[in-house]
UniProtKB/Swiss-Prot annotation:
It comes from the Eukaryota. It comes from Arabidopsis thaliana. Keywords: Antimicrobial, Disulfide bond, Fungicide, Plant defense, Secreted, Signal. Its main location: secreted. Disulfide bonds join 27-71, 34-56, 40-65, 44-67. This is Defensin-like protein 173. One of its GO terms (biological process) is killing of cells of another organism. Residues 1-23 form the signal peptide. The lineage of its organism: Eukaryota, Viridiplantae, Streptophyta, Embryophyta, Tracheophyta. Belongs to the DEFL family. PANTHER family: DEFENSIN-LIKE PROTEIN 171-RELATED, DEFENSIN-LIKE PROTEIN 183. It is found in: Secreted. InterPro entries: LCR, Scorpion_toxin-like_sf. The gene is LCR63. GO terms for cellular component: extracellular region.
Amino acid sequence: MAKAPSPLVFPIIFLIIFALVEPNMGCIQIIGRCIKIPDCSASCRKFLGPHASGYCDNDGAGGTCICTYPCQTKEIHM
């Protein structure tokens, strides 16, 4: 019969996986009100590059145009 693994095996594996993976959630920038910017996504790509995307957060008072884009980092990833 096989022996059950120690209760610490899975938490240790979990911690090792998260230590080796560097999370990159991206960056955000607010570029103005949605009533003044007709297409948030196109405006974000114009200002922040082709990998940017945008959406209108309807938080009241005309909404806010929010851009998400990859963060620029000085670190070299291997």
